[in-house]
A protein has these predicted regions:
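Polar low-complexity intrinsically disordered regions
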Residues: 1-52
Length: 52
């Protein structure tokens, strides 16, 4: 399904970060706030899914 965004946590530069990827693996954005990552996905008409 192509209307999904995958949200993945990562540790970068001493901070917890949240990476947002399209279903095809394209990196869309990075943020330091998990809630904001989900908001960004929804604002772009994507269904966010958490990836571990």
């Amino acid at each position: 399904d192509w209307d999904v965004a995958f949200i993945k946590s990562d540790y970068q530069n001493g901070k917890d970060m949240w990476l947002i990827y399209a279903a095809d693996g394209t990196k869309l954005a990075t943020t330091d706030n998990r809630d904001y990552a989900f908001i960004v996905a929804k604002q772009n008409n994507l269904t966010p899914r958490s990836v571990h």
